[in-house]
Amino acid sequence: VQENFAKAFDSDGISANGYTPTLTIPRSGILGDIVLKSADEVQAFLRATNQKRFSNGSVSNYLPSTLEKQFVALTLSVKFDAWDSNFSASTVLLGSLKVVNFRIGTNTVPTIQDVLDQTKKFLDGDSSYSLRLASGGGVLSAGELTKLVDNLNLSFDGSPYGSVWAQANLGL
């Protein structure tokens, strides 16, 4: 994170001229978004606990939810993979893998990037959030969405072929 955050999150290519790379965690209502502007802030956010809460320019004494932390971790993985062709051995971008046992709305098979976009909507309280199981039922709850993003984060942790969950749920 320390080495690559500024480069991978520098969307306009001019950070040397004053642009600050950011990773934004949406929050609904009047709370306002949490904006992480450095690798140090990302690491502090991910390490925050009840005993050591997170503070920066956008929040003070904040305890991130597990879903918010999982969202940040998956965002880092997808962004680093897209930015650095050597991030993984695969030629397929992480964000473009399909999450085959889930749907957006009733028919669309989401990619990992789509799951991130839906997670943003969920965190922001956006009524267009529509991620669900392919087998039917309502939209995923906070707990179900957290578990999905956690599984995505763990999918290739320590295994070049993916976890058992990844092998059953991810495809091209």
Describe these PLM feature segments:
Residues 1-172:
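Soluble extracellular-acting proteins and domains
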